[in-house]
Structure formats: structure tokens, C-alpha cells
From Swiss-Prot:
Annotated ATP 1 binding sites: 633-640
Function: ATP-dependent transporter of the ATP-binding cassette (ABC) family that actively extrudes physiological compounds, and xenobiotics from cells. Lipophilic anion transporter that mediates ATP-dependent transport of glucuronide conjugates such as estradiol-17-beta-o-glucuronide and GSH conjugates such as leukotriene C4 (LTC4). May contribute to regulate the transport of organic compounds in testes across the blood-testis-barrier. Mediates multidrug resistance (MDR) in cancer cells by preventing the intracellular accumulation of certain antitumor drugs, such as, docetaxel and paclitaxel.
CDD domains to which the protein is assigned, alphabetical: ABC_6TM_MRP7_D1_like, ABC_6TM_MRP7_D2_like, ABCC_MRP_domain1, ABCC_MRP_domain2
GO annotation terms (biological process): leukotriene metabolic process; leukotriene transport; lipid transport; transmembrane transport
pH-activity note: Optimum pH is 7.5.
Listed Polar residues bias regions: 826-840
Region of interest called Disordered, as start-end residue ranges on this chain: 825-860
Organism annotation: Homo sapiens (Human)
Source species taxonomy: Eukaryota, Metazoa, Chordata, Craniata, Vertebrata
Any one GO cellular component localisation term in the record: lysosomal membrane
EC number: 7.6.2.2, 7.6.2.3
Entry's transmembrane regions: 32-52, 70-90, 102-122, 133-153, 172-192, 293-313, 320-340, 391-411, 414-434, 507-527, 538-558, 875-895, 933-953, 974-994, 1051-1071, 1153-1173, 1182-1202
Coiled-coil residue windows: none
The protein's name: ATP-binding cassette sub-family C member 10
Length: 1492
């Protein structure tokens, strides 16, 4: 290289590149270093901007500043070429050799041409509104010093003195023109960048609203440096990342719509998921293996070049060019390796996000297509959350699976080069652990599968618990069902405990392995007769650490692959479930008769594909257009199953089903109304265009106008999830209104009249079913047979069979009717009836929640801002346990101290050997350059005489073999202690994180169970489930993993600083400025990282809720043809979550590249200084080598510490969210336990004293001064119109809501003074909506396990369920999720049986028999009267016969008691409200009274 430089510069080989010539810099140095290099950089940088996309207004002229810069750049590209012409002119035109001038001139010309093109592109891009990239302008000005120095050189050479030669004068003039052009360029950049001319085209969106698109259209430099993240990070630093919309939009290739299209091209039903993922994204992913390969190779360049550089400094005989190459190679390798590894991680995560978008979308699409055999909601949510994430961990593990063995092979070869075959002993020891690792991995995989099953069970149980939280609180089952959840959690933690301790064993084996292998290698080497030297020892130690790196990581890689395989199998099982297939289910041809809408012939249906459940058989059914067909029968006879079969929600085992106009769908109103968490209007429109006239007619037909008039915001009022803020009647009517508004030709109505009072039922029948729907075909299931007298036909079902069909006059007499005596006492009066329906006074009882006047119930999920608070760290510390946490820290410090001690002892040993072998050199002990610094690049050189021991060292024995035995014994002893400390630390850490996982979940569950019902009404289930699923999973696994890395990095840094401080104190001077730089970078990153993590969790909850909502309303979605709209909504929610995930990953890579480049800069600076000192004869090779090795280790540790700390903080957001519920969730006032004994309620007297209840300040009172007294054993019926306050009485009695004033007494005891459990244990309720959970019949009947089987069977017989339960397998028969094995009526009967088991003195019945037939209802009323003859019974009336036998009737109106007397007395009082209700109910027999 010296010869080449000498020829190019025309200088001597001894000094090829002189820095000074006279009073100015050397011309060759100026042209090469100050001109050619900056111009080359300008050319490369400009080329990076050539791909910038143009704005839509690119044809418009740019601003004056841009035009001036373009002109100056063009001139600067021409002047260097003109400058070459005088070079050929004699005499002495050129100041240097022709080759040098041509090289410098051509590089400058190419650079400015490239820059001119880049400026043209930027001027017509979005950058044209500003001055453009600052870096580009600054680099363009870098050649200015070279021009100035060249002018000075000409002046010193006398170019301006006579005789004036044309060649030099021409060149000097061109130089001055170039300086002028460069000055013009600077002025052009300084000019304001905009605005555009007034006639410029305006963007479609205002500039402040135009969304940014991440990465797309950015230059190469911006992509490599992540400069495009600057606006996002600036918003994060200012605290402006408050919602997902504040994050830049996804690149095109990450958009969920694009991913869905690409994936669907490779996906077909029944295909293997991994094949489809490979077809869609696999090729791009495999191509990234090249980056991984190059990065792995570059990992070995650092230690090799470092060794060569130290050798160059030690020998001092190699030419300078070699040193320059080593230094440049070291710096270039560090920079290139950092960029490649960073880009590899970034691109891999982008592929992971692509696969994630595709998997989550296909899971949701599959959920929309599921047939009747569908998994529980909790299991589906686990697939969406846990399993999908574990599956996608494959992307980070696959390339490591081949990259680590490659590293292993190369390291083994280098180790062989150092110690020969002695390395085999250590290798054998390492390989012996491979089968051990295989056994551990197998156990981990098996335990993982079991853990996921237990997690499914837990999440499913929590889902059911949340759906039935009202009944749970009514019955006081929080503790019992909480114990069931804890039992599932205990089984889950049992498997997690096995996994964690196996992981701890794995970590211990591989962490202790380096020292053990080192001992084996050194003993073998000595026994083979070789002499240990410092070079051999430290080189071998470094290579052993490089050997351990792949072996240490390999178990984690295998574990990740195994976890991905487990989750892949679970997702594949879900995707393989049979689909809902209308093409195969229905006949392809419509019914033969044009007037026939529906035809079933020989059709056999079942809820499962093999027909093991109750079957529904229809021999023949033909329904003509416009008919009203009633369906009647006993409870559980198959009425709802018949409608589900027509809707395609059952398995058709055989037969023929033909529907005319199938593509138009059905109007479906299910028995359990499905209501979305949205406004009432949105629920009714259900995605259809708003038609004011039609909407008005639907509201009138469904009797919703009066209800809307009392709601806070009318039809814009938001209702809770599943409509919990509405009464049962309101939910039923909104669901019916939704079906009617869709304007279908065939309607399937499953008992929509069951939950409404008589007035509303008559209104729905005449205005809706016989009114708006009169021109449609209707199938109506109902137990209220009086409303079927005007039906065209009635179907009688029994045991799943259609046994009779005919006109109402033939079929209805076969159905047991209510004795007409009930109707004889009521005299119909048209005037009274008319009076009863006018101006009903209502309150807001139907909306039992805290709503603002705007009607908004669902509030945005709260999100913390700023740094994770100190109390979150304290909460996790306390969850681990203070004693255990201190023990973990102590064992960690002890482990690091013994590791440092082992390396220190080894350095002392080698120092003594060198002293004996080189007595002429009195050298102190060598530096412990192998100080366990977690860096594979350490000490491939002999550190020399740089370490001065702090402690006095023992003198070596004179005998050489005794020395070896002595040193090896001490070394092995220290290593053994280190091994025990490592084991102790691994076990303690596993135990601590397990303790924290158990504690956090237990506190969360307890706090949620103790929350008031208002919290559950205003909070989507998915939001709560996100805590129990994703956040708990993070606290279980992800947080301990990254926290372990953080603690290891922190301990390693402390050990390193201790060594630096004792052995080379001056090196610590570099630490403060380095720490300041690192601090500012990580602080800038952390501000955004925290918010992005929070937004990621925030946007995950709607995905959970949307899937749960979809599964709950699947039949309605498919019947109305709304699946496409819901799929689009899922893509929208997924896009918001993917934004957060992508931005989180990109900001992590932004931090990583800066930390790595700063480390490379430190290494490069030390290497450059070393070369300068070497030229001056001042370099100390050992000092330089030690500095470089420690610089490599120090920067790596600081980078790892910053990265792991920020990731730990991000993971702690999950703990923060758990703590938010644990600490901030409102709790029910528990009261104080009174010393009353277990049987304190002996009589059953109830007294309300001036009770006032308002759901929130500012709303009318739901109960307004209610006062009444119920005597012990009295039967009290409670009636009133919708919203009169009936259900509020029960809420106050059970203290689900606390009254504003007044009190409730039970046997003279104020309920507000009682503990909740003490109160509710003495009360019983039969709820309107039955609550069952997954489990056996026994567990559902007796959740607390208080009764024997004989009592359970007796209660079932009294409720006429014994035969059904026997057919299901007895008391141990499984009911399925939500008790779906039973019909709705059977579920209500099971809840009644549950109440029959109670010993409570007070029973509350909330319209408990609305979904059973009249005959069963009569039998049940007799059972209730007999079983609770001596107890106080409060009955909210729904059917007249349930309260006419009561001792007294309480009539409520607008939250006040207006009447209270016996039924006979009130009936005979003229103009009484009870008589009006009674008379209005007589329009049908039997009459009915108010809804909830």
C-alpha cells in the first residue's frame, strides 16, 4: 500500500502521505483525505435519496432556495471536469501527479451529479415543503476546506506572481468559482423552504391530519438509521402518544388487508397452517438467513482483527498500512456487523408481524365459519393471545437453530488450533449434556402442553364467571367460584413450576459449564506434557466462552421451537374443526311450489356431528309464503332446536332442507337476546344504512319509543356488554327491532314475548308480528299460547319430534292451558285498558349503570403515562417476597464475585508461570482479562504486564508439578463455589418469580370478584380477560425471562467495573461521558417505548372483546349476512394493534443500532489513537489491547443493560395493569361482621324504611322513599310497569347497590351493618337469567358442596329435571360452557332446583319461569308454594298466577310504593293501578304483569 500511495502522490515510500508541506497541508493529503473521501461520502448519501417517492404535485416548480441549490450543484459537477483540462497544459499546470488530479476530479464530478439528481427528487417530494434533510446539506459542505487549502497552496506557490502561467491561473479561477458555487449552495439551503406558491395543489387532507406512513418511501439511509421514526419519538418524548391513531400507519406490506389477501392465496380449507405461512412469507424469511450468515461470520472478525492489531503493536516491524487495515477492519467490521445484525432482527420481526396478522385474521375468519361443534370462548381467546404469540416465536428461533451449530463448529476449529486434541475432553463433557438437555426439553414440552390446557380451563372459567357475576354476587359465591379459579390456577402453576425449575437446571448447567470445561481442557493439556502460557490460557478461555454461547442458547432455541410446535398443533386443531357450510346444508334448489318458502322432509338434526345429543327430527314441514307458524311444546322439547336447524346452526344428519331466497338471509331473534356494546341505534341498524322512516316504524312496532324517551341520550345511549344495562324486556325488543329493520322475507322468532309484560306483548303481537311483518313468513316459538290464536298454523313439538301440525283450533287445546278461573275475576274494560297504557311513568331503572348525559357508557380504557411508577417495582418486589428477593440479589452478587475470583486466580497462576520461565523479566501477575465479561471477543492476546494485584499473593512452591496441582486445586475450588452459587441463584430466581406469579393473580382475582356490579356493566369482558390472559402470561413468563437477563447484565457490569477500578483505573475516565450518551439515548427511547407498550395492551383488549362478541352472536351474524362487516371490523382492530407492535419493535431497533454504533465508535477511537501513538513511538501494545478488549466488553454490557432495562420496563407495564385493577378497582362496601351467629335470621322479616336509590348523582331516583314491611313467612308479589323499580328493590336488598338514604332491616337488623357474605348467605334468589358454568351437574347445583346426592336428586325431581339429568350421565354429567347442553327453560329449572336446596329464610324470585311452558309453570308454582311455605317469598311477577296467590301485592310506580294490599282487595278497588294492570293483562289468557 505504501508503494501505491507513493506512486499516486509522487512521494517517497518511507513517507507516502505527508501531512504537511511547508506552511500548509500536503497536497496529496488534501486531495485524498479532505476532498475525495468527502465527495465519495456525498455520492453515497445522495444515492440513498434517489428512491424518495414524489408528491402528487411533483410537476409544480420548487421554491427559490431549491432552485439555487440545483443550479449550484450542476455547476459544481461541471467545474471539476473543466479543472482537468489545464492539467495537460505545460508548463507545471498540475500541482501533483496526473493520476491524483484525475481521481479527485472524477470523484467530485460523480458526487455532484449524484447530488443534483437527489436534489431534484427531494424538491418534488414531501421534503420540498422544507429545506430537506440536514445531513445531506452538511455533507455537501464538507469539501469546502479542501478548496480553501488548495487556494492557499496556490498562493504559497506563487501562482499569482509573475510570470503568470495560463494553466495554474485557470485552475485557480476554477477553484474560486467552485468556492462561489459552494457559497451559493449554502445560501440556497439557508433560504426558507416554503410555503409553496399560492397556485400549488393542496393535499387532500390538511397537512396536520395527513397520516404518516412508516418506512414506505424512505431513503436507504433513513431505513438503516430509522430516521423516519423521529416524529414518533418526538411525540413520545412530549407525552403525545395517547391513542393508537398517534402512531404512524403501517407499511403497505404489513397492512392486515394486504396480508389477508396474500395468505388467502396460499390457504385452502383443510390445508396445513405451516405450509400456507411458508408459501406466503417463507421465501422472504429464508432469504434473511443470508444476513444471519454474514453477521455470524463478522462475529469472528472482531477477536481475530483485535489479535492482529495487538500483534502489530507488539512487533512494531509491520508496515503502517497493515496497522491501518487492521484498525479500519476492526471499525468497519463492528459497524457493518451492527448494521447487519440490526437489520436482520428488524426484518425478522417484520416477517413475524406479517405472519401474526395472517394468523390472527384466519383465526377470526375461522370463528365466523364454525359449525355447531365450537370450542369454549376462553379456549378461542387463548388461541388468539397466548398460542398465536408462541407460534410466532418460531421466526426468532429457526435461524438460530442452524446459526448456533455453525458458530459451534467454527469455534471448535479455532480451539483446536490453540490447544490441539486437549479440547476433546471439554467437548465430550459438553456433549454429554446434550442428552440431558434433550430430556429436559422433552419434559418442558410435555409440561407446556399441560400448562396450556390448565390455562384454557382457567380463562374459560373466568369468562363464565364474568358473564354471571350478578348471580354470583346475589348468591354470595365469590369465594366458592374464586376457589375453583384458584384451583385451576394452582394446576397451571404446578406445570409452570416444573418448567421454571427445569429451565433453572438448564441455565445452571450451561452457566457453570465454561469453568468446568476450562479445568478439563487445562488438566488434559498439562497431562499431555505441554506447558501452559498466558496466550494459550486466555485464548482458550475466550474460545470456550464462544463455545458456550451457542451451547447455552441452544436449549432456549429448542424450547422456543417446541413451544411453537405445541401451539401450532392447537391452532391447527381449531382450524380443522368442521365449518358452517350452507351450500352443503341446504338444498341447492328452492322448494318446488313457488308459494312455499320453507320445506323440510325427513330431516334429522343434532348439536353434534355423530348424533349423540338430543336429536330433532322433522318428517315433513312445508311453510307457505306469508304464514305465521307457531311452535309450542314442553320445556326442552326442541322448539329452539328447530329454529336453529332452519337457520343452519345444527348438524344435518340426513334429510332435505330447502329455503326460498336463502341468499337474503333470515330475520333472527334468539331466545337469549344478543346485544352489542354499542348505542341502541347501532344495535338496531346493525350496519344497514339509516332510513329515518323505516327506523321510526320499527321503534313504534317494537314499543321502544317510551323506553328511549327516558334514557339519558335516547337511541344514542350506549348499552353494556350483552345489554347488561337494560332490562330483559328491553333486550328482547331491541333484538326484535334489529331483526325487523333488516327487512328479511323469513323470520325466526324464538320466544320474543317471554320477557315483556302484557301491554308490551300485545303491542308487539299486533304492531310488529301481525303488523310490520304481516307480509313476511314468520315462525314463532312461545309458551304463551294465547298469542297464537291468530296464527295460520301451529306445530307441536315433543322430545325433539314434530308430532302434530295444524290450525290453532286443533293444536292449542292439546296444550295444557291455565284454568279459566284466573280470568273470571277480571272484568275487561276498554276504557280502563286504554287508560292503563297512556302516559306510563317510568324511571331509569332499566339503565342500571352510571351513564353520562351523553349516553356514553363505555369509557376508553385508562392508560398510565410517563415512566413506570416506583410503586409498580415495589409491588413486584413484594409479590416475590422481601426475604426471597434479597436472597436472589445476594446469590447473584456472590455468583459474580466468585466468577471474578476464579479469573483473578487464573491470571495470578499464569503470572507466576511467566515469572519462573522468564526470570530476567520481573513481571507482576497478568491482567484478569478473562473476567467473565460476557463477550466472546475477549483476550485473544497476552495482556502482558498491565495488571497490578491488589491483594498479596502466595508464593509459588519450587516444584513445578506441585505448583500445577496447587493452582489447579485452588482454581477448581473457586469454580466449585461459583457453581454452587450459580445453582442457588437459578433456583431462588425460579422460586421468586413463581411466587410473584401466584401472588399477582390471586390479588387480581380477589379484587375483581369484590368489585361492584357497576364496574362489570361498564367494562367489556375482553378488557378484563386481557388482564387474566395476556398480562398474567407476561408476569408468568416474559417478565421473568427479561428480568433474569437484566440482573445478569447488572451483575456483570459491577464485576467489570470492579476489575477496571483495581487494575486499570484510568480507563474509568471514559465511563462518565459514555454513560451520559447512553442515558440520553435510552431516555429518549424509553419515553416512547412505555407508551407504545401500553397502547399495545390497550388495543389488544378490543380484539379479545370482538372475538368473544362474535362467538356469542354467531347465529345472528350469519342469519343477517353481517359476517363480512364483522371481518372488516376485526381487520381494523388488528391494524391498530399491529401499529403498536410494529412501532414497538422499530423503536427497539432504533435504540439498538445507536447503542451498537456508539460502541463501535469507542473501539474505533481507541484503535485510531493507538496507531497515532505507534507512529510517534508512544504506544504500549498491552495497554492498547487491554483498552480495546475492555471497550468491547463495556459497550456490550452497557448496551445489554439499557436494552434489557427498557424491555423489563415495557414488560412491567403488564404488572402495572394488574396493579391498576388490584389497587384502583372500586370495591363493594363490605360492612362489619356482627356477632350474630350463623342463624341470626330466624324469622324472615323484611322492612324498607324510606329507601332512596339513585344510580348516579343527577339522575332521577330509581327508588324514591320506598317504605314497606314484609312479615315473616309472608308471600309478597311485586308488580309494576317496566322501569318502576322492581329489580332495584332486589339490588338494594342484596346490597349490590347501596341506597342514598334510608335503610333495610332483616329481622330488625340493619343490612348496612352486616358483612356482605353474612347478609347474602341468608338470602336466596331465583334469577331471571339462569347462570350455569362449565362443570358437572353436581357442581352447578351445589357450588359450595354443602348437600348430599340424595338432596340433589330430590330437588331435580321437584323441578321435573331428573329424567333429563339421568340421560346426560347423572350428577357427574358435564353441562358444557354456560350450560349449553340444556335448553334455556331447562337451565331456569336447574336454577330453581338450586334454590330449593337453600335454607335461607327469604327467597326472591325474579320472573324465574318465563321460559317454561304453562303446565310446567303450574307444577313449579305448586312446588315453590309447598317448599317455601314457612319462608318469606318476594316474587317479581311476570305471570299472573305467580302472584294472585300471594298474601299481599306491592305495586310500584316511578320508584314509589303506590299500593300495598291483598290481591283481592286491590282487584276490587276501582281505578287502582293493580286493577288497570290486571285488566290490561286480560287481553290474553293467562294474563301477565310487568317486566323487569
Amino acid at each position: 500500500m505504501e508503494r501505491l500511495l507513493a506512486q499516486l502522490c509522487g512521494s517517497s515510500a518511507a513517507w507516502p502521505l505527508p501531512l504537511w508541506e511547508g506552511d500548509t497541508t500536503g497536497h496529496c493529503f488534501t486531495q485524498l483525505v479532505l476532498s475525495a473521501l468527502p465527495h465519495a461520502l456525498l455520492a453515497v448519501l445522495s444515492a440513498c435519496y434517489l428512491g424518495t417517492p414524489r408528491s402528487p404535485d411533483y410537476i409544480l416548480p420548487c421554491s427559490p432556495g431549491w432552485r439555487l441549490r440545483l443550479a449550484a450543484s450542476f455547476l459544481l459537477s461541471v467545474f471539476p471536469l473543466l479543472d482537468l483540462l489545464p492539467v495537460a497544459l505545460p508548463p507545471g499546470a498540475g500541482p501533483g501527479p496526473i493520476g491524483l488530479e484525475v481521481l479527485a476530479g472524477c470523484v467530485a464530478a460523480v458526487a455532484w451529479i449524484s447530488h443534483s439528481l437527489a436534489l431534484w427528487v427531494l424538491a418534488h417530494s414531501p421534503h420540498g415543503h422544507s429545506r430537506g434533510p440536514l445531513a445531506l446539506a452538511l455533507v455537501a459542505l464538507l469539501p469546502a476546506p479542501a478548496l480553501v487549502l488548495t487556494v492557499l497552496w496556490h498562493c504559497q506557490r506563487g501562482t499569482l506572481l509573475p510570470p503568470l502561467l495560463p494553466g495554474p491561473m485557470a485552475r485557480l479561477c476554477l477553484l474560486i468559482l467552485q468556492l462561489a458555487a459552494l457559497l451559493a449552495y449554502a445560501l440556497g439551503w439557508a433560504a426558507p423552504g416554503g410555503p409553496r406558491e399560492p397556485w400549488a395543489q393542496e393535499p387532500l387532507l390538511p397537512e396536520d391530519q395527513e397520516p404518516e406512513v412508516a418506512e414506505d418511501g424512505e431513503s436507504w439511509l433513513s431505513r438503516f438509521s430509522y430516521a423516519w421514526l423521529a416524529p414518533l419519538l418526538a411525540r413520545g418524548a412530549c407525552g403525545e402518544l395517547r391513542q393508537p391513531q398517534d402512531i404512524c400507519r403501517l407499511p403497505h406490506r404489513l397492512q392486515p388487508t394486504y396480508l389477508a389477501r396474500v395468505f388467502q392465496a396460499h390457504w385452502q380449507e383443510g390445508a396445513r397452517l405451516w405450509r400456507a405461512l411458508y408459501g406466503a412469507f417463507g421465501r422472504c424469511y429464508l432469504a434473511l438467513g443470508l444476513l444471519k450468515l454474514v453477521g455470524t461470520m463478522l462475529g469472528f472478525s472482531g477477536p481475530l482483527l483485535l489479535s492482529l492489531l495487538v500483534g502489530f503493536l507488539e512487533e512494531g516491524q509491520e508496515p503502517l498500512s497493515h496497522g491501518l487495515l487492521y484498525a479500519l477492519g476492526l471499525a468497519g467490521g463492528a459497524v457493518l456487523g451492527a448494521v447487519l445484525q440490526n437489520q436482520y432482527g428488524y426484518e425478522v420481526y417484520k416477517v413475524t408481524l406479517q405472519a401474526r396478522g395472517a394468523v390472527l385474521n384466519i383465526l377470526y375468519c375461522k370463528a365466523l365459519q364454525l359449525g355447531p361443534s365450537r370450542p369454549p370462548t376462553g379456549e378461542a381467546l387463548n388461541l388468539l393471545g397466548t398460542d398465536s404469540e408462541r407460534l410466532l416465536n418460531f421466526a426468532g428461533s429457526f435461524h438460530e437453530a442452524w446459526g448456533l451449530p455453525l458458530q459451534l463448529a467454527i469455534t471448535l476449529y479455532l480451539l483446536y488450533q490453540q490447544v490441539g486434541v486437549a479440547f476433546v475432553g471439554g467437548l465430550i463433557l459438553a456433549l454429554l449434556l446434550v442428552p440431558v438437555n434433550k430430556v429436559i426439553a422433552t419434559r418442558i414440552m410435555a409440561s407446556n402442553q399441560e400448562m396450556l390446557q390448565h390455562k384454557d380451563a382457567r380463562v374459560k372459567l373466568v369468562t363464565e364467571l364474568l358473564s354471571g357475576i350478578r348471580v354470583i354476587k346475589f348468591c354470595g359465591w365469590e369465594q366458592a367460584l374464586g376457589a375453583r379459579v384458584e384451583a385451576c390456577r394452582a394446576r397451571e402453576l404446578g406445570r409452570l413450576r416444573v418448567i421454571k425449575y427445569l429451565d433453572a437446571a438448564c441455565v445452571y448447567l450451561w452457566a457453570a459449564l465454561p469453568v468446568v470445561i476450562s479445568i478439563v481442557i487445562f488438566i488434559t493439556y498439562v497431562l499431555m506434557g505441554h506447558q501452559l502460557t498466558a496466550t494459550k490460557v486466555f485464548t482458550a478461555l475466550a474460545l470456550v466462552r464462544m463455545l458456550i454461547l451457542p451451547l447455552n442458547n441452544f436449549p432456549w432455541v429448542i424450547n422456543g421451537l417446541l413451544e411453537a410446535k405445541v401451539s401450532l398443533d392447537r391452532i391447527q386443531l381449531f382450524l380443522d374443526l368442521p365449518n358452517h357450510n350452507p351450500q352443503a346444508y341446504y338444498s341447492p334448489d328452492p322448494p318446488a311450489e313457488p308459494s312455499t318458502v320453507l320445506e323440510l322432509h325427513g330431516a334429522l338434526f343434532s348439536w353434534d356431528p355423530v348424533g349423540t345429543s338430543l336429536e330433532t327430527f322433522i318428517s315433513h314441514l312445508e311453510v307457505k309464503k306469508g304464514m305465521l307458524v307457531g311452535i309450542v311444546g314442553k320445556v326442552g322439547c326442541g322448539k329452539s332446536s328447530l329454529l336453529a336447524a332452519i337457520a343452519g346452526e345444527l348438524h344435518r344428519l340426513r334429510g332435505h332442507v330447502a329455503v326460498r331466497g336463502l341468499s337474503k338471509g333470515f330475520g333472527l331473534a334468539t331466545q337469549e337476546p344478543w346485544i352489542q356494546f354499542a348505542t341502541i341505534r347501532d344495535n338496531i341498524l346493525f350496519g344497514k344504512t339509516f332510513d329515518a322512516q323505516l327506523y321510526k316504524e320499527v321503534l313504534e312496532a317494537c314499543a321502544l319509543n317510551d323506553d328511549l324517551s327516558i334514557l339519558p341520550a335516547g337511541d344514542q345511549t350506549e348499552v353494556g356488554e350483552k345489554g347488561v344495562t337494560l332490562s330483559g324486556g328491553q333486550r328482547a325488543r331491541i333484538a326484535l327491532a334489529r331483526a325487523v329493520y333488516q327487512e328479511k322475507e323469513l323470520y325466526l322468532l324464538d320466544d320474543p314475548l317471554a320477557a315483556v309484560d302484557a301491554d308490551v306483548a300485545n303491542h308487539l303481537l299486533h304492531r310488529c308480528i301481525l303488523g310490520m311483518l304481516s307480509y313476511t313468513t314468520r315462525l314463532l316459538c312461545t309458551h304463551r299460547t294465547e298469542y297464537l290464536e291468530r296464527a295460520d298454523a301451529v306445530l307441536l313439538m315433543e322430545a325433539g319430534r314434530l308430532i302434530r301440525a295444524g290450525p290453532p283450533s286443533e293444536i292449542l287445546p292439546l296444550v295444557q292451558a291455565v284454568p279459566k278461573a284466573w280470568a273470571e275475576n277480571g272484568q275487561e274494560s276498554d276504557s280502563a285498558t286504554a287508560q292503563s297504557v297512556q302516559n306510563p311513568e317510568k324511571t331509569k331503572e332499566g339503565l342500571e349503570e352510571e351513564q353520562s348525559t351523553s349516553g356514553r357508557l363505555l369509557q376508553e380504557e385508562s392508560k398510565k403515562e410517563g415512566a413506570v411508577a416506583l410503586h409498580v417495582y415495589q409491588a413486584y418486589w413484594k409479590a416475590v417476597g422481601q426475604g426471597l428477593a434479597l436472597a436472589i440479589l445476594f446469590s447473584l452478587l456472590l455468583m459474580q464475585a466468585t466468577r471474578n475470583a476464579a479469573d483473578w486466580w487464573l491470571s495470578h497462576w499464569i503470572s507466576q508461570l511467566k515469572a519462573e520461565n522468564s526470570s530476567q523479566e520481573a513481571q507482576p501477575s497478568t491482567s484478569p482479562a478473562s473476567m467473565g465479561l460476557f463477550s466472546p471477543q475477549l483476550l485473544l492476546f497476552s495482556p502482558g504486564n498491565l495488571y497490578i494485584p491488589v491483594f498479596p499473593l502466595p508464593k509459588a512452591a519450587p516444584n513445578g508439578s506441585s505448583d500445577i496441582r496447587f493452582y489447579l486445586t485452588v482454581y477448581a475450588t473457586i469454580a466449585g463455589v461459583n457453581s454452587l452459587c450459580t445453582l442457588l441463584r437459578a433456583v431462588l430466581f425460579a422460586a421468586g418469580t413463581l411466587q410473584a406469579a401466584a401472588t399477582l393473580h390471586r390479588r387480581l382475582l380477589h379484587r375483581v370478584l369484590m368489585a361492584p356490579v357497576t364496574f362489570f356493566n361498564a367494562t367489556p369482558t375482553g378488557r378484563i380477560l386481557n388482564r387474566f390472559s395476556s398480562d398474567v402470561a407476561c408476569a408468568d413468563d416474559s417478565l421473568p425471562f427479561i428480568l433474569n437477563i437484566l440482573l445478569a447484565n447488572a451483575a456483570g457490569l459491577l464485576g467489570l467495573l470492579a476489575v477496571l477500578g483495581s487494575g486499570l483505573p484510568w480507563l474509568l475516565l471514559l465511563l462518565p461521558p459514555l454513560s451520559i450518551m447512553y442515558y440520553h439515548v435510552q431516555r429518549h427511547y424509553r419515553a416512547s417505548s412505555r407508551e407504545l407498550r401500553r397502547l399495545g395492551s390497550l388495543t389488544l383488549s378490543p380484539l379479545y372483546s370482538h372475538l368473544a362478541d362474535t362467538l356469542a352472536g354467531l347465529s345472528v351474524l350469519r342469519a343477517t349476512g353481517a359476517t363480512y362487516r364483522f371481518e372488516e371490523e376485526n381487520l381494523r382492530l388488528l391494524e391498530l394493534n399491529q401499529r403498536c407492535q410494529f412501532a414497538t419493535s422499530a423503536t427497539m431497533q432504533w435504540l439498538d443500532i445507536r447503542l451498537q454504533l456508539m460502541g463501535a465508535a469507542v473501539v474505533s477511537a481507541i484503535a485510531g489513537i493507538a496507531l497515532v501513538q505507534h507512529q510517534q513511538g508512544l504506544a504500549n501494545p498491552g495497554l492498547v489491547g487491554l483498552s480495546l478488549s475492555y471497550a468491547l466488553s463495556l459497550t456490550g454490557l452497557l448496551s445489554g443493560l439499557v436494552s434489557s432495562f427498557t424491555q423489563t420496563e415495557a414488560m412491567l407495564v403488564s404488572v402495572e395493569r394488574l396493579e391498576e385493577y388490584t389497587c384502583d378497582l372500586p370495591q363493594e362496601p363490605q360492612g362489619q361482621p356482627l356477632q350474630l351467629g350463623t342463624g341470626w335470621l330466624t324469622q324472615g322479616g323484611v322492612e324498607f324504611q324510606d329507601v332512596v336509590l339513585a344510580y348516579r348523582p343527577g339522575l332521577p331516583n330509581a327508588l324514591d322513599g320506598v317504605t314497606f314491611c314484609v312479615q315473616p313467612g309472608e308471600k309478597l308479589g311485586i308488580v309494576g310497569r317496566t322501569g318502576s323499580g322492581k329489580s332495584s328493590l332486589l339490588l338494594v336488598l342484596f346490597r349490590l347497590l347501596e341506597p342514598s338514604s334510608g335503610r333495610v332491616l332483616l329481622d330488625g337488623v340493619d343490612t348496612s351493618q352486616l358483612e356482605l357474605a353474612q347478609l347474602r348467605s341468608q338470602l336466596a334468589i331465583i334469577p331471571q337469567e339462569p347462570f350455569l358454568f362449565s362443570g358437572t351437574v353436581r357442581e352447578n347445583l351445589d357450588p359450595q358442596g354443602l348437600h348430599k346426592d340424595r338432596a340433589l336428586w330430590q330437588a331435580l325431581k321437584q323441578c321435573h329435571l331428573s329424567e333429563v339429568i339421568t340421560s346426560m350421565g347423572g350428577l357427574d354429567g358435564e353441562l358444557g360452557e354456560g350450560g349449553r347442553s340444556l335448553s334455556l327453560g331447562q337451565r331456569q329449572l336447574l336454577c330453581l332446583a338450586r334454590a330449593l336446596l337453600t335454607d335461607a329464610k327469604i327467597l326472591c324470585i325474579d320472573e324465574a319461569t318465563a321460559s317454561v311452558d304453562q303446565k310446567t309453570d303450574q307444577l313449579l308454582q305448586q312446588t315453590i308454594c309447598k317448599r317455601f311455605a314457612n319462608k318469606t317469598v318476594l316474587t317479581i311477577a311476570h305471570r299472573l298466577n305467580t302472584i294472585l296467590n300471594s298474601d299481599r301485592v306491592l305495586v310500584l310506580q316511578a320508584g314509589r310504593v303506590v299500593e300495598l294490599d291483598s290481591p283481592a282487595t286491590l282487584r276490587n278497588q276501582p281505578h287502582s293501578l293493580f286493577q288497570q294492570l290486571l285488566q290490561s293483562s286480560q287481553q290474553g289468557v293467562p294474563a301477565s304483569l310487568g317486566g323487569p
